[in-house]
Design a protein with these regions (language model features):
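Residues that cap or flank secondary-structure elements
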Residues: 75, 192-193
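Active-site entrance/lid segments in N-terminal catalytic domains of soluble metabolic enzymes
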Residues: 1-183
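Conserved active-site-proximal phosphate/metal-binding subdomains
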Residues: 154-169, 173, 177-190, 196-274
Length: 274
């Protein structure tokens, strides 16, 4: 959803200005049903962002993008199809499917020449979610190249309800590993969410994980694109500064810092209600 803005800031395009001009009359209207992405612009912006990144890549490492299925804007299926295929066309090494079951996402890419060459994986938070996904992908004779198993302590959107504290990453990983073994499927598993130390990582690797995913710990790294002020918020945050809420328009619970601007906006909206 932010790719047009990213393109404007990085490549001096004017996609956001163009869209704002078209829907200027609707800016103050809470009903956004008429607002649509220009899918041609979404494709162009994605190809610019991904293509320039791939051109700048050095070494043998791979570059992946995370693509959320859950969109609150109109025409979500068509938008998702454009985003996925534009990334493949621009040469991305791999795509991680997130924020949704993605039951139709492989089909949206099936006609792309790189569908079987690029690394395609999915984030799940339960064995049930993976089972549903695999039922769809096996019809295309294309298994995922990896599965990220995200636990209840992850930052950002969670694949759980507000009862997230009742779940445990290690248990979910074990359940999925057992299921894949039973089905004789060899798919690399990558635990994520709540892996805070090297010891945490080693424990999962010793149990057979192909890798681990760590994100929040790297928000304060030099390579992270966040402003220094935001990095400092992460660095100094304590447990009481972290909250799980339902302010996201996706409908998923979300873990965030209490200082995030999204919460200030949410509080302001509530205070303005009659």
């Amino acid at each position: 959803a932010m790719i047009l803005d990213v393109s404007d800031r990085r490549f001096d395009t004017e996609f956001v200005k163009e869209k704002t001009k078209i829907y200027k009359h609707n800016i103050l209207n809470s009903d956004k049903s008429e607002v649509l992405f220009n899918l041609g612009r979404v494709a162009e912006a994605t190809k610019l962002h991904v293509g320039k990144t791939m051109e700048a890549k050095q070494g043998d490492g791979m570059v992946f993008v995370n693509c959320m299925e859950k969109l609150s804007m109109n025409a979500p299926r068509d938008t998702l199809q454009v985003r996925l295929n534009a990334a493949l066309d621009a040469g991305i090494d791999g795509i991680t499917l997130s924020a949704g079951l993605h039951l139709g996402s492989f089909a949206l890419m099936a006609d792309n020449p790189r569908f079987r060459d690029a690394k395609l994986g999915i984030i799940v938070s339960s064995v049930r979610a993976l089972q549903l996904f695999l039922r769809k992908t096996t019809k295309l004779n294309r298994l995922p190249d990896f599965v990220v198993i995200e636990g209840p302590l992850a930052g950002g959107h969670l694949g759980f309800g507000m009862d997230w504290a009742q779940y445990d990453l290690a248990t979910i990983v074990a359940e999925i590993a057992a299921y894949l073994k039973k089905e004789q499927l060899d798919i690399p598993l990558i635990p994520a969410g709540g892996i805070f130390t090297g010891t945490d990582a080693v424990e999962f690797l010793e149990k057979g994980a192909a890798a681990v995913q760590v994100a929040t710990r790297f928000t304060v790294a030099k390579e992270c694109g966040l402003p220094d002020k935001v990095k400092q918020e992460y660095f100094t945050a304590r447990e009481e500064n972290i909250v799980v809420n339902t302010v996201s328009p996706t409908g998923y619970p979300m873990r965030m810092l209490t200082s995030t601007p999204a919460l200030a906006i949410s509080r302001k909206k509530r205070s303005c209600r009659p």
